[in-house]
């Protein structure tokens, strides 16, 4: 049994995977304001069934190293299993990193690429919608073709609120156009702008991918964004965790 953890900037996604990989238990835990690593680990423990006894705890984390070390210690105390961290490298689990400096690639993107390799061996364009939106290409030989980074909806809202004197930090959501209030105008502008940016970036990256490349979308905002894209896009909400599992199995066979 494995416990898979995707520690993003806004929330933790988790999955408990039994031997054989069938019947995943999954969930999401948003970080509480002011909560430290120990409190966060305790909150996570409250979400995961008490019967879970993982042989391995596999982690992809974008959080600060000092915070992460304390969190790892709390995980080991709670579950006893060793904590294994995926880190971006030149190559892993059949994927070759396309960055000039491989360690610069975010580990969440690296995990998503490994997951995409497992589910789309013909190649893929991967969109990950989180605090930031990333778009990456993968060819049929497992080579990462590079990608792009764009601010997510929350960052776009915050940029308008902080960079102007009178625009509010309005709620995220769709709105009709033409909008008839400032809040609706911001919501519509961000939603349509982010969708258009993703479409343009994905089209450019797909041009470098094999003709049969799959279109995969993941991340906390992936479902909402996918609803506004063409039906060719496949929503895989746990692609990062799928990549973690594939990497962990690959490492176990080495």
From Swiss-Prot:
Its main location: cytoplasm. It comes from the Bacteria. Pathway: Cofactor biosynthesis; coenzyme A biosynthesis; CoA from (R)-pantothenate: step 1/5. GO terms for biological process: coenzyme A biosynthetic process. It is found in: Cytoplasm. GO terms for cellular component: cytoplasm. Keywords: ATP-binding, Coenzyme A biosynthesis, Cytoplasm, Kinase, Metal-binding, Nucleotide-binding, Potassium, Transferase. Its EC number is 2.7.1.33. A monovalent cation. Ammonium or potassium. It holds the Pfam family Pan_kinase. GO terms for molecular function: ATP binding; metal ion binding; pantothenate kinase activity. SUPFAM superfamilies: Actin-like ATPase domain. ATP binds at residues 6-13, 131. It is an enzyme of class 2 (transferase). K(+) binds at residue 128. It catalyses: (R)-pantothenate + ATP = (R)-4'-phosphopantothenate + ADP + H(+). Catalyzes the phosphorylation of pantothenate (Pan), the first step in CoA biosynthesis. Belongs to the type III pantothenate kinase family. This is Type III pantothenate kinase. The gene is coaX.
